[in-house]
Amino acid sequence: MNTKFPITAKGFKKLEHELKHLKHVERKKISEDIAEAREHGDLSENAEYEAAREKQAFIEGRIKELEDMAARAEIIDISKLSGDNIKFGATVTLIDDDTEEKVTYIVVGEYEADITRKRVSIASPIAKALIGKSVGDFVEVTTPKGSKSYEVVEVEYKALEL
């Protein structure tokens, strides 16, 4: 998959930091763990060895995934974005039509998405429904919990805190 994907400059630095840590710290540590487990004898019945090999496979897979993401990243400086329409990087305040509660989301890339911090992936159902909308628009979002309707009450672009 060669498609570019958006990421903030801070998000890209975080991605690079994770990649560097995996390559230079975790990879070395797991090699040492495997060597130590080998010293315990018969590898066919060595649970420590098997666990270390599984962890190594996970780490190598994550390294490949992050390298691919880094190669495809389209770094976007949110502080230079503006406008009334919702796009990547927007901080969007909505009012739930049913409860009249305000909720704020930030539209980010897949690597930076974290619903506990109200950061939604640009590929998520809510972000897909919001893209291109502006203040005063109503959006219908279909989620696993059902359909929700919101009114867009504020759109702004500001730097993200990591």
Curated annotation (Swiss-Prot):
Q: Which Gene3D superfamilies match?
A: Transcription elongation factor, GreA/GreB, C-terminal domain, Transcription elongation factor, GreA/GreB, N-terminal domain
Q: Which UniProt keywords apply?
A: Coiled coil, DNA-binding, Transcription, Transcription regulation
Q: Does the keyword field hold Glycosyltransferase?
A: no
Q: Which InterPro entries match?
A: GreA/GreB_C_sf (IPR036953), TF_GreA/GreB_CS (IPR018151), Tscrpt_elong_fac_GreA (IPR006359), Tscrpt_elong_fac_GreA/B (IPR028624), Tscrpt_elong_fac_GreA/B_C (IPR001437), Tscrpt_elong_fac_GreA/B_fam (IPR023459), Tscrpt_elong_fac_GreA/B_N (IPR022691), Tscrpt_elong_fac_GreA/B_N_sf (IPR036805)
Q: Which cysteine pairs make disulfide bonds?
A: none
PANTHER family in the cross-refs: TRANSCRIPTION ELONGATION FACTOR GREA (PTHR30437:SF4)
Q: Which GO terms describe its biological process?
A: DNA-templated transcription elongation; regulation of DNA-templated transcription elongation
Spell out the family assignment given in the record's similarity comment: Belongs to the GreA/GreB family.
Described purpose of this protein according to its UniProt entry: Necessary for efficient RNA polymerase transcription elongation past template-encoded arresting sites. The arresting sites in DNA have the property of trapping a certain fraction of elongating RNA polymerases that pass through, resulting in locked ternary complexes. Cleavage of the nascent transcript by cleavage factors such as GreA or GreB allows the resumption of elongation from the new 3'terminus. GreA releases sequences of 2 to 3 nucleotides.
- Record GO terms (molecular function): DNA binding; RNA polymerase binding
Record Pfam families: GreA_GreB, GreA_GreB_N
According to UniProt, the name of this protein is Transcription elongation factor GreA
Q: Which residue windows are coiled coil? A: 45-75
SUPFAM superfamilies (alphabetical): FKBP-like, GreA transcript cleavage protein, N-terminal domain
This protein's superkingdom?
Bacteria
